[in-house]
Amino acid sequence: MIFPDGTAKKLTEEGYVLEKHLFERWIAEEAVSEGAQLQLSHKLRSMEKQYDANGKFTGWLCDGNGEQFPIQTKVIIDASGVAAVASKILDLNTRGQVIAGMQYEMLEVPTDDYLDFYIWPEYAEKGYLWMIPKCDGRANVGLVTEDKPRTKKALDEFIEATHFKDLEQVPPPWKEKGNPAFGGTIPISGPFELTYDDGLMLVGDAAGFTSPLFEGGSHLALKSATFAADVAAEQIAANDLSASKMSRYQKLWSNEFPPYGKILRGKSALFDLTDEDMSIMAQCFPDEMSNMGPHGKLAVCLRLLMRRPSLYGKRIIPAMLSFGYSRAKFYGW
């Protein structure tokens, strides 16, 4: 992690970098091999609950654009991403906040196999920038920012001001022409209040499941999908798809996922700090942050408060804790 004054600290965890377009294609192929049907060029427009003569919920009637519509189904698992289609159609939740993300794939990027996270508000307002190494000297260089209109300009300015300046940018494999930049929007408000209804569960970004500080979401999506699949199978077998039974899904992910409220408060506190405050905080961290136990964290807090007592009033402790909760073992990054 690189802070505004250039102070760099390590938080070491082993992990994998996914070529996401290949990973998602593989998931789809695996599903089809197990009997799923993959229907492209379809857009859901409406969802209507179905009931039997006794008023018991029996499933959904879905309509929209595409040759397979209308579709009748017992359970819907909404994995529609940030669009959160089912939630929007049913007015199930208020729309959450989103942040803009954009990146380039670059060639011959110097790397030590660590992911570099730059917490530099000058370029990424209430966000951060990254360098994510991939195979064969390739890397993704990008940012997320709440200043959505300035996203691409800010990324270009960051690249121009750093050692990435003269590196070649190439379009991603699925983008044959046009500007090589690619990205989209990411939910940042935390989980929706309701992630279930009669015969319905929301997973991944469609449920607001992203890591609050660094906005990663693949492992949260995969785990929530596993929970949803288990609940769907059990409730179909039990012939009870009522919301009261589907609510078990929300209990499962609530017990598994990190304390979103704490992380969001810590994130807010972090971005309330000035660049100088952030840099002083970084200088008080050990060079390797992954091994800090309770005593190590206490020592950092004491060093911070001795150097700048005013940081206590700026909620520096929640800001520091947000880093710990953003590690991979807590579904972070």
Region annotations inferred by a language model:
Residues 26, 30-173, 187, 192, ...:
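Predominantly flavin-linked oxidoreductase catalytic cores and closely associated redox partners
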Residues 1-30:
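A conserved beta-strand/loop capping segment in the N-terminal third of enzymes
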Residues 17, 46, 149-231, 236-237, ...:
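FAD/FMN-dependent oxidoreductases across multiple families
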